[in-house]
Design a protein with these regions (language model features):
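Acidic-and-aromatic substrate-binding clefts and catalytic sites of carbohydrate-active enzymes
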Residues: 11-15, 32-44, 67-69, 106-108, ...
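Conserved, mostly hydrophobic/aromatic
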Residues: 23, 31, 49, 79, ...
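Catalytic-core regions built around general acid/base machinery
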Residues: 44-53, 126-134, 191, 221-226
């Protein structure tokens, strides 16, 4: 059975204690905090994790126009600084992985003034700088492929894997988000196998972006492949409302009852799938 967590940024303005209480009640192992070091208090996070018997294995980076790793100059340096501050926060709460989206979420058209090769060069340079700092503290960066309707850069597992290979850093790997993969990958298990040597983390949501089991994603085949490749990391739930801009989820008033339902649905479905796979061995 995998360690199962839930990412925190999706619950909008909900008090952190409400989120932690829900996770304990539903049987979760951990919480994935947003990488927002200026908004979250590490001591409060630690106290709540202790109170509700949770841990934190990862942070979810939030990458907007002000945190653009494909940029050069001051803008690129600002993105690196954001990641370094996130590393410091991760160290305080015990997280060993930070999820990194190389380009701003919401920008779906390539900047006209730069070629794709220049954008890649900027991303490689900036991520490598951040990775040097993170790795010195035992923290890894996991690059995430985001679907083409949310960003123009590194949309597939092949592209994000190639970027990680080009960065060529021991502290840089990739993560797999099954929602984005349901849009971009022809075969989810095959894509997981392809990135097996660099796979650090997994996000779980159905093809509708709701909780696992509410759409048509074949989670059994994905989990079977994760077992086959020896994946030992977390499965972290990242379900949300059906929104055109995913980051707007962090700005809305949370419907606590719906989040309660999603959280229980997600973990119950994934645990049931895991048990079925074990029984079939």
């Amino acid at each position: 059975m995998h360690h199962i967590g839930m990412t925190q940024w999706i619950v909008g303005d909900e008090p952190l204690e409400t989120s932690c209480r829900r996770l304990q009640a539903c049987g979760y192992d951990g919480i994935e905090f947003a990488a927002e070091p200026d908004q979250l208090d590490a001591d409060e996070c630690l106290a709540l994790m202790k109170r509700y018997d949770l841990n934190c294995r990862s942070l979810c980076g939030i990458f907007n126009e002000e945190r653009d790793l494909t940029a050069s100059g001051e803008k690129g340096e600002a993105a690196v600084l954001y990641l370094k501050k996130s590393v410091d926060f991760a160290e305080k709460v015990g997280a060993k992985i930070i999820i990194v989206v190389p380009s701003p979420v919401g920008r779906t058209v390539k900047p006209k003034e730069l070629s794709m090769e220049e954008l890649k060069e900027n991303a490689v340079r900036n991520i490598r700088k951040a990775a040097d700092y993170a790795w010195s503290k035992g923290i890894s960066l996991a690059l995430e492929a985001i679907n083409r309707y949310e960003t123009y850069f590194a949309n597939t597992m092949t592209k994000v894997y190639e970027l990680a290979q080009r960065i060529d850093h021991p502290g840089v790997g990739v993560m797999a988000d099954l929602f984005h993969m349901s849009i971009e990958e022809a075969n989810i298990p095959s894509s997981l196998y392809m990135v097996r040597d660099r796979l650090l983390h997994v996000h779980i949501a159905d093809n509708t972006r709701e909780a696992a089991g509410m759409g048509h994603t074949d989670f059994a085949s994905a989990l079977r492949m994760l077992d086959n490749i020896g994946y030992q990391g977390s499965l972290t739930m990242e379900f949300m409302y059906r929104l055109a801009d995913p980051y707007s989820a962090s700005e809305i008033s949370t419907q606590t009852g719906l989040m309660d339902h999603y959280a229980k649905q997600a973990i119950d479905f994934i645990r049931m799938t895991e048990r079925s796979l074990l029984a079939a061995e």
